[in-house]
């Protein structure tokens, strides 16, 4: 996983050891054998969402036991299983630096060879969708008010584009491996989102509802959204309110403390913060002002800047703002460290009806490779 808070790391200066990494442990002793970090000082929620594949790679006539790790960034890291060293060279490349006060982003990020980068990783006016003249014009007008550029653009006070978005690239589904051909099959989403940061410090007096709103924005909006859900499987704020309205307060607080399903626990929250977050979700506590000095805050005081959430970036008709393909399936030759082929994955029937070729779609799932040479995948959304 990544270090918290996801989008501001001024209280965790440095690379953040063991976050965003592949970790090899000796199963007999529990001792660390090696680790390899794929993102330094993550402020993009670019955690490793899926386990690596155990693979073999042939180099100079020798078979090497290795692992292949897909990522949300669309980087494939291929590492020697014994040593953790990259089989194909990884370069530390300078990336843009944060302008948020107190934040110290790491100056470089690890990039595998371009032949092992299988996602779109840049969004400027040059990459804008050409689906219709009206859509292109609207997107470009929006972009002129935003930070744009290459991957690892840090969140700032101004809206910043993120491509791949926070769900990838590759997400939970992972990859499939053909051990005969030594080929890895990995699907990928190519859709942009945007993010910005706001000051989080509560005023001297604040209602329980408003304090809960600030906490929700920092802790919950990235999955549950402000209105619509951001992550598949996470109920939207609207749906969440309908569910929680019928639940005892103690039950809601138990979920905050212990987590449930895919939701992690938020045991760091003080009792005051739990009550405020519950009040916001239940839409009460708007009238009574709380004295800031009397509140016990463990989280709200620690994070001076919070994200506005993982915000969808669509054209006026609801389609992705960047050029297709918006979803792909790639076959990667692990001996050569390069993409054999890349196919468009998914389609919008309404766009096909207009005469457009399949564009691909956002996808959440993984492929299966068979011994008979077939690859099966659903995953499209």
Model-derived features with residue positions:
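Beta-sheet-rich non-transmembrane sensory/scaffold domains
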Residues: 1-208, 273-381
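Extracytoplasmic electron-transfer domains, predominantly the class I c-type cytochrome c fold
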Residues: 207-210, 214-217, 222-292, 299, ...
């Amino acid at each position: 996983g990544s270090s918290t808070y996801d989008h501001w790391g001024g209280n965790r200066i440095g690379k953040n050891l063991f976050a965003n990494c592949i970790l090899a442990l000796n199963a007999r002793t529990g001792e660390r054998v090696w680790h390899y970090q794929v993102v330094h000082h993550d402020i993009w929620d670019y955690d490793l969402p899926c386990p690596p594949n155990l693979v073999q790679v042939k180099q100079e006539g020798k078979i090497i036991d290795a692992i292949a790790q897909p990522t949300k960034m669309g980087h494939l890291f291929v590492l020697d299983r014994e040593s953790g060293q990259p089989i194909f060279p990884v370069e530390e490349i300078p990336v843009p630096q944060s302008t948020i006060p107190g934040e110290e982003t790491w100056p470089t990020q690890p990039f595998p060879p371009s032949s092992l980068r299988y996602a779109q990783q840049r969004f400027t006016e040059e990459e804008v969708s050409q689906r219709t003249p009206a859509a292109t014009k609207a997107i470009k007008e929006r972009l002129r008010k935003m930070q744009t550029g290459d991957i690892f653009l840090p969140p700032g006070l101004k809206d910043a584009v993120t491509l791949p978005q926070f769900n990838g690239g590759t997400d939970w589904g992972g990859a499939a491996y053909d051990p005969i051909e030594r080929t890895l099959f990995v699907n990928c989403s190519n859709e942009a989102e945007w993010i910005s940061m706001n000051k989080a410090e509560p005023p001297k007096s604040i209602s329980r509802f408003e304090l809960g709103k600030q906490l929700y924005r920092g802790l919950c909006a990235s999955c549950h959204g402000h209105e619509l859900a951001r992550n598949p499987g996470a109920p939207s704020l609207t749906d969440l309110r309908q569910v929680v309205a019928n639940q005892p307060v103690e039950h809601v607080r138990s979920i905050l403390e212990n987590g449930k399903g895919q939701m992690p626990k938020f045991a760091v929250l003080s009792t005051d913060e739990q009550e405020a977050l519950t009040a916001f979700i239940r839409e009460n506590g708007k009238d009574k002002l709380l004295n800031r000095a009397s509140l016990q805050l463990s989280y709200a005081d620690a994070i001076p800047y919070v994200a506005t959430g993982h915000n969808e970036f669509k054209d006026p008709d609801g389609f992705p703002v960047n050029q297709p393909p918006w979803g792909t399936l790639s076959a990667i030759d692990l001996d050569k460290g390069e993409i054999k082929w890349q196919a468009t994955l998914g389609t919008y029937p309404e766009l096909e009806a207009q005469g457009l070729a399949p564009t691909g779609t956002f996808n959440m799932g993984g492929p299966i490779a068979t011994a008979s040479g077939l690859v099966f995948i659903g995953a499209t959304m």
